């Protein structure tokens, strides 16, 4: 707006020129579709800290990891994994998979989690075909009565705990020299690496939890026979403080705005490359949810 006003004022002037330019630029549909905004609109609501163990399960896929061997002629197989985590305790499981078929992933989660631990009420996952396939949906809803919560690929923060575990997992995996460890199975070196990595995650102190995941699950230390009594009230309060702090930091970057039914909004096109139109729309808001999200009528307003 300022640059447009400065450019026009070099040659022209009229009464209420500033207001006219501001209104024209602010309501220009072409400008809003083509120019990418750095700041997002609307403050994010504060989430409630999770502190009930085994109530929710977060799952995702990680990989493929490809590591080149330093030994000539030795090829290290590609690593592809399913990761599972209880966000309340931080307890973590990881298992390799051969393909991304819905039935394959469903069997892994059933065998590596649902037959080992208390059944969750809710499972959080993304929109990958392996998670929305018929076999996976039937396992969750028909076999175990678990409600699925599908997050948007545009909002990975909704499954942020999994992303943090993936980062830790990647760091630990890269720290191993597979080909130089004589104790690893040369045909399947990843099985030993994943077992050691999972133990490292479970037995490491988490600042958010103020404990090790293993301590919260078993009530004792993972290495020494030392009892651990979890204060879930204090854990919840600490988690909520961190959520509140991060929420303030995130909202400080956003433009305050209260969405209303009937508003017209642009929808960001996350698949667009840098030369394509970054926004689509405008679309009409049909409903504003209590968590700050909105439901759109997916027919562009003309």
What are these regions (language model features)?
Residues 26-28, 35-38, 56-58, 120, ...:
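Domain-scale segment recognizer with a strong primary affinity
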Residues 95-96, 122-126:
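Short catalytic-loop micro-motif centered on adjacent basic/acidic residues
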Residues 39-58:
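Structured nucleic-acid-interacting core domains from mobile-element enzymes and related host factors
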Residues 1-10:
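Reverse-transcribing Pol proteins
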Residues 77, 94-116:
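Active-site beta-loop-alpha junctions of metal-dependent nucleic acid enzymes
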Residues 53-93, 98, 271-272:
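An active-site-proximal beta-strand-loop segment
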Residues 14-32:
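Conserved short alpha-helical interface segments
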Residues 21, 60, 90, 109, ...:
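Conserved hydrophobic/aromatic pocket- or pore-lining residues that grip, position, or stack substrates
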